[in-house]
Every structure is written in C-alpha cells, then in structure tokens.
Amino acid sequence: MNISIISVGKIKEKFLKAAIDEYSKRLSKYCKLNIIEVTDEKTPDNASLKEENIIKEKEGNLILKHIKDNSFVIALDLKGKAITSEEFSDLIENCRLTGNSTIAFVIGGSLGLSEQVLSRANYKLSFSKMTFPHQLFRVMLLEQVYRAFRILCGEPYHK
C-alpha cells in the first residue's frame, strides 16, 4: 500500500523531525510512505476573509498538484468525521480491499484546507474539535497510521 501525507509547511523543530523519522521507519514495514511538504503562504495579521481564502486557494493548488488521480484522498478537517483508532484501521483496510492502493492524507496550513481540496476528498476526517499546530499534527497522523497497521496485522498496540 502507498501512503502519501501532503501537508502545508516545513517541519523546523528537531524533536518533531525525530518523531516523524521514527514513525516513518516503523511504517516502512507496512507501506510505502511518501511525505510531501508544500509551501505555506504568509498570512498577514489582519487578513480579511477574502485574503484568507486566496491564501487557502494558493496552498490548495499546490496540494492538488501532488494528488494522483487514483488516490483515495482523506482530508484532515475540523468538520470531518471523528472515529476511533479501530475504525480508522477499518477505513485503511477498506481502501485496500476496494482496490485503492494509494491513500493521500492532506493536512492544511494554519487556515485549513481550500474548498477545492475538500471537494477532491473522498473522506473528511477529524481527530478532535480542538485545533492543533499542523506540524505536530503530522506526527499525530503518522502515529495513528502506524497504530492502524498494527491493528490490521493483529499486533499488540498501546490502548
């Protein structure tokens, strides 16, 4: 299975890079992982709604360029569906069983995802109603993908 994580912005903090590297190494046993970072646009402090939408569109266009036609796209969005780790593993397994061997997870920038990206998504997923820094969220997503594969393989995982 091919897993892509397409996210806005670069990881600068060493501790986050170390966690991403660790989960990437662990996941190599289960899937081919591709992490794609697109440039985040600068948001002025007093940006209008129109300016924010333009920024989301620019970031969205960069994201869409990296989504393959055959990808099952899962957008991480506050308005998405909240599910358990077991349900998340079922979602990944259902993709595989229905012939979707490529899953693209999409993480937006500080303003979220554009309507174009959300429209392209096959599934909208929320981890919580809380807001997280998108850099930290990448680590959280990798951990849940790793946990999902452990569940699917019947291997022990921390509950």
From Swiss-Prot:
InterPro entries: Alpha/beta_knot_MTases, RlmH-like, tRNA_m1G_MTases_N. Its main location: cytoplasm. It is an enzyme of class 2 (transferase). Its EC number is 2.1.1.177. Transmembrane segments: none annotated. It is found in: Cytoplasm. It catalyses: pseudouridine(1915) in 23S rRNA + S-adenosyl-L-methionine = N(3)-methylpseudouridine(1915) in 23S rRNA + S-adenosyl-L-homocysteine + H(+). One of its GO terms (molecular function) is rRNA (pseudouridine-N3-)-methyltransferase activity. Keywords: Cytoplasm, Methyltransferase, rRNA processing, S-adenosyl-L-methionine, Transferase. S-adenosyl-L-methionine binds at residues 76, 108, 127-132. GO terms for cellular component: cytoplasm. Homodimer. Specifically methylates the pseudouridine at position 1915 (m3Psi1915) in 23S rRNA. Belongs to the RNA methyltransferase RlmH family. This is Ribosomal RNA large subunit methyltransferase H. The gene is rlmH.
